[in-house]
């Protein structure tokens, strides 16, 4: 009567024993970068990136609507989110090994014994039946092998979550930049069409004056050249607009994406104009690709614990408890109770160097993960430095281009007045038209590039994420 209790007690002891981890104590590698930003970036003022989500960064309502659509429908993002489910399932599978299972089992067996093998020199048919609960093989994790494998699976799962956050931030940036390029093409196209109408009108007047002998062939050819220049620029802008439109449709991923994209330029500015970069240490705690790299490093560290534990004895438990009988009708009769308890001790003696090779492999993979982590930090800091430099210089460039465009427009007005009053010839007026148009185009391009650079800075700093939006995707619908 006490033996079953002994088996149950042994099982309870196994559950309460804490595994001693063989994994090395984790220490975050020192960041291979400076402790502060250099130059003007250290004094840069603006919204704090750690409290700035993308909806606050994007001030244009149309762009916010398109980004929301992309986050709900983009296929590449959906694939990344499904990878989270796979990593979560893998972690749950590995975690299940830390607790014993329990199965209900029923077996029946009939066996014929030939006469020459039986004690009575005659053939016999024996039957046995059993029903009860069975404990599948359960490893008593004394040296932390299973715990280390579970920790590694957990870190891989957490890394996949950070990768999904990085993918979302990247999608916000890609949609924003595609929309900014599209909006810039619309602005250039509107200016080009307006310029083409004006030049065609001027060309018609020159043609009439040439027929009357009041304009030269040179005036005629110069005016025609400006018309053809505007036509070529119009076709170029039409091509760029359509390419940006197609890129947006792909990113949005919705069947009605084409109808959702506006056909005219939107408001300006579209983005928050000033962002403070924070400190380098904050960047390490915020950028999802850095956090994902650290989770992968932690997983490799846990793998070393599992590899070390393989050198030590492994204890497994199996058992069952139920009733047995030679007749099915006797399974629940008095005295039919049966049980078994089978502990197994496995001690590695010779494995051809397999365990040592596995340990060397785990250590090499950890060293590789350290290098990858440090490389990710260096890449992140390079991206931030580039984005800060681009944002600052493009802001000053945009200001200069605006002044240049305004100056060219004033010069065009003066040239037109001087031409109409007969002070200057037509060539001077045409040259002022050409300069004004090119400088207006340059200002539109510079303004677009500065907005795109702000998006680059937002992404490089780790972006801001709407924590209310789930990272889980439902396979039957949208994420």
Curated annotation (Swiss-Prot):
Keywords recorded for this protein, A-Z: Antibiotic resistance, Cell outer membrane, Lipoprotein, Membrane, Palmitate, Signal, Transmembrane, Transmembrane beta strand
Pfam families attached to this UniProt entry: OEP
Sites of N-palmitoyl cysteine lipidation: 20
Predominant place of localization: membrane
Organism ancestry: Bacteria, Pseudomonadati, Pseudomonadota, Gammaproteobacteria, Pseudomonadales
Gene: oprJ
GO cellular component, one term: cell outer membrane
Membrane topology summary: Lipid-anchor
GO molecular function: efflux transmembrane transporter activity; transmembrane transporter activity
Protein name: Outer membrane protein OprJ
Subcellular location, record wording: Cell outer membrane
Family note: Belongs to the outer membrane factor (OMF) (TC 1.B.17) family.
Disordered as annotated region, ranges: 102-121
UniProt-listed GO biological process terms: response to antibiotic; transmembrane transport
Organism name: Pseudomonas aeruginosa (strain ATCC 15692 / DSM 22644 / CIP 104116 / JCM 14847 / LMG 12228 / 1C / PRS 101 / PAO1)
Entry annotated with the keyword DNA-binding: no
Signal peptide location: 1-19
Lipid addition sites, S-diacylglycerol cysteine: 20
Function: Channel-forming component of a multidrug resistance efflux pump.
The keyword Lipoprotein is annotated on this UniProt entry: yes
